[in-house]
């Protein structure tokens, strides 16, 4: 477990971008302790939007209900500025099995007083199927605060799967939500981008908004999949605002599209450019227009947005707010590194958009590092190694190339990709330097890093190796130099020298 560093976000000033300061995972569940310990550690450390506490979950199932839940297996998490990062959406599941049904006391994770929560690459599931006479409400996530971000997150339950309890702002990037009745319900401005929605029973209802904010639920480029073709897009809980833009409905809903309200009539229940699974526009002429509620209220609404009306539903308009929040920037991924074995280490280039790199050995999480190298001590010869870069919130990007480790010594070089080694000439090397100030004669001049294979046309300076470790820029260790005088040039040939380790 590591203390957070000064910042994990990319700052800009006068159009200039600054590199994201490095920051390793603060807590790896199963390595640094269980989720109960992670929860306590996050609460004990001062955090802010610039210093997220990052909890990483390697692939596996994590029973929060019995570990941190109350008598009904509800887990409260009230610390702001925390990232929940999984290894994969399919491989990581946080779950509970609430005993009594309820919308307010069954959540797998309940965020009552937390703001600025980031989740990526995991599944949250409430496995309970317990019902009362009238309902089977078992929540996965219940959130109250502002600035929630979900990237490639899957929620699985039945009724009331996802409960946005207060009027904050939330952004979904991809992901999937499964349920039966009102399985996305509550308040707030929530922008769903490319999210998959899966009604899991006949006559299912996707949304039930009780909107007090300006925009409500906005679905853009959503995909609806189901084995049932008689579901509904939503019903108003209280004055709901819900729009579906550019939605691909692989399973098509009831012709009316919307149900009458639970309590009060909706403000807006509308679609724009709805398509079937083949990308063909759906006929929306049968969509519901007239609504009445149990209090005698009524509304007559246009179920189809015009081009002008639809154009207003931008991410900036819906979630920007007075502080110009841009959550899509937080979900951007750092590039996959290109890794190479050099001697007894694996190396890669730095990336100013990565806060750290997660290391995987033989398909399993091994470690994380803010450095651009890892030693191979403890990693067996023949192991398969790959890396994934973490973005500003800790979320992992695509895999790097995978290498198979080979036997190496401090003086061996396994990276020959940088030059044509068929013309290597080290015939004029007098000696390998063994202490500062020693020199050797080489054919050429350049500056090289020990372990590299580099063209050599003259004087050469190499960095001294401290017991086999690289003395690289930004590493917190002394950097000593050897100077090697180049005295011969062989014309008409490519001259290559392998930079060798000092002893």
Residue ranges: model-predicted function:
Residues 362-363, 485:
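Short strand-turn-strand beta-turns centered on an Asx-Gly dipeptide
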Residues 438, 443-503:
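C-terminal outer-membrane/trafficking sorting elements
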Residues 20-345, 352-361, 369-405:
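Sequence-level preference for short, compositionally simple segments enriched
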Residues 406-410:
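Extracellular interdomain linker/stem segments of modular secreted and single-pass surface proteins
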Residues 11-19:
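Hydrophobic h-region of N-terminal signal peptides that target proteins for export
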Residues 2-10:
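Sec-dependent signal peptide recognition
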Residues 339-341, 411, 415-416, 465:
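Disulfide-bonded cysteine-rich modules in secreted/extracellular proteins
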């Amino acid at each position: 477990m590591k203390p957070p560093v000064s910042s994990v976000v990319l700052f800009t000033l006068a159009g200039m971008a600054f590199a994201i300061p490095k920051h390793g995972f603060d807590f790896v569940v199963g390595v640094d302790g269980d989720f109960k310990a992670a929860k306590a550690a996050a609460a004990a450390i001062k955090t802010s939007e610039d210093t997220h506490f990052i909890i990483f979950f390697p692939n596996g199932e994590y029973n929060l209900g019995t570990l941190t839940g109350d008598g009904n297996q509800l887990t409260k998490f009230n610390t702001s500025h925390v990232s929940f990062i999984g290894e994969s959406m399919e491989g990581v599941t946080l779950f509970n099995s609430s005993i009594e049904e309820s919308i307010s006391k069954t959540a797998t994770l309940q965020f009552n007083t937390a703001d600025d929560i980031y989740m990526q690459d995991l599944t949250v599931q409430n496995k309970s199927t317990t019902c009362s006479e009238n309902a089977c409400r078992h929540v996965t996530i219940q959130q109250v605060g502002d600035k929630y971000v979900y990237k490639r997150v899957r929620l699985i339950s039945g009724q009331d799967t996802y409960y946005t309890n207060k009027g904050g702002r939330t952004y979904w990037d991809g992901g999937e939500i499964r349920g039966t009745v009102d399985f996305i319900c509550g308040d707030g401005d929530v922008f769903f981008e490319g999210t998959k929605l899966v009604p899991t029973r006949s006559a299912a209802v996707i949304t039930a908004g009780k909107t007090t904010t300006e925009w409500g639920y906005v679905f853009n480029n959503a995909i609806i999949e189901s084995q049932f073709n008689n579901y509904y897009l939503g019903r108003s809980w209280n004055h709901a605002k819900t729009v579906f833009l550019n939605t691909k409905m692989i399973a098509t809903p009831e012709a009316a599209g919307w149900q009458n309200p639970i309590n009060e009539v909706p403000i807006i229940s509308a679609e724009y450019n709805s398509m079937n699974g083949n990308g063909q526009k759906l006929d929306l002429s049968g969509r519901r227009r007239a609504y009445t509620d149990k209090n005698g209220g009524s509304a007559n609404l246009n179920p189809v947005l015009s081009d002008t009306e639809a154009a207003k539903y931008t991410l900036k308009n819906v979630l920007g707010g007075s502080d110009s929040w841009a959550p899509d920037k937080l979900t951007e991924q750092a590039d996959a590194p290109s890794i190479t074995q050099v001697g007894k280490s694996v190396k890669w280039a730095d990336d100013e958009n990565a806060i750290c790199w997660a290391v995987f050995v033989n398909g399993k999480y091994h470690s994380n590092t803010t450095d651009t190298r890892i030693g191979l001590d403890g990693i067996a010869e023949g192991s398969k190694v790959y890396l994934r870069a973490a973005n500003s919130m800790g979320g992992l990007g695509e895999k790097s190339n995978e290498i198979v480790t080979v036997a190496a010594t401090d003086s061996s070089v396994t990276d020959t990709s940088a030059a044509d080694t068929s013309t290597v000439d080290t015939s004029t090397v007098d000696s390998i330097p063994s202490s500062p100030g020693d020199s050797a004669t080489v054919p050429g001049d350049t500056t090289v890093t020990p372990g590299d294979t580099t063209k050599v046309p003259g004087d050469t300076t190499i960095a001294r190796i401290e017991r086999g470790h690289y003395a690289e820029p930004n590493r917190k260790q002394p950097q000593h130099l050897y100077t090697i005088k180049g005295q011969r040039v062989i014309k008409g040939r490519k001259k290559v020298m392998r930079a060798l380790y000092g002893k």
